Design a protein with these regions (language model features):
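Compact, glycine-rich, soluble single-domain proteins
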Residues: 49-53, 57-73, 79-83
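Glycine- and Gly-Pro-enriched alpha-helical subdomains that act as flexible
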Residues: 5, 9-57, 66
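Short basic, glycine-rich beta-strand/loop surfaces that mediate nucleic-acid
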Residues: 17, 69-81, 94-140
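Short amphipathic beta-strand starts and helix->beta connectors
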Residues: 3, 53-64, 97-107
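A generic structural motif
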Residues: 22-26, 82, 124
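Conserved active-site and cofactor/substrate-binding residues in soluble primary-metabolism enzymes
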Residues: 38, 42, 81-84, 128
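A generic alpha-helix structural signal
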Residues: 44-47, 90, 134
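Short amphipathic alpha-helices within nucleic acid-binding modules
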Residues: 84-91
Length: 140
């Protein structure tokens, strides 16, 4: 069980950014997009991946994570066009010391059995730190 402190001093805004990949190879030399429900499910997986890992390992929450859980659960969805773009944002987040979780779909319903990177979540961390990595990405 993960416990939060009774009160958390919030210094600055804390948020999570979900980065969704828009385009995928269709296997015929073209591109395709995901069904809207599939995109939403992938974003949900990303949003809770960090917390699931904390629970499995019995890790304590950071102050930013506690503030996010006790606050408004602020989430922003942005998009990138390709797997390469997704990997670039992921690496920038890791290099900046941010919480970042990549989601790879197993391929059972959309990708003919091929595991495929679909999205990632960055944070919860301080907004100004996340903005350094995602501030130029388009809202989705």
């Amino acid at each position: 069980v993960i416990e939060c402190s009774q009160e958390v001093e919030i210094v600055g805004e804390v948020k999570q950014v979900i980065v969704i990949r828009k385009y995928y190879p269709d296997g015929k030399g073209g591109i395709k997009t995901l069904r809207r429900g599939k995109e939403i499910a992938q974003g949900c997986h990303a949003s809770i991946a960090w917390l699931s890992e904390k629970v499995r390992h019995g890790s304590k929450l950071t102050k930013d994570e506690e503030a996010w859980i006790q606050g408004a659960f602020t989430k922003i969805c942005v998009c990138v066009n390709s797997e390469e773009d997704l990997l670039e944002v992921y690496q920038k987040a890791l290099d900046a010391g941010l919480t970042a979780k990549m989601i790879t779909d197993a391929g059972r319903t959309e990708f003919d059995g091929i595991p495929t990177r679909t999205c990632l979540a960055i944070g919860p961390n301080k907004s100004e730190e996340i903005d350094k990595v995602t501030g130029e990405l388009k809202l989705y």
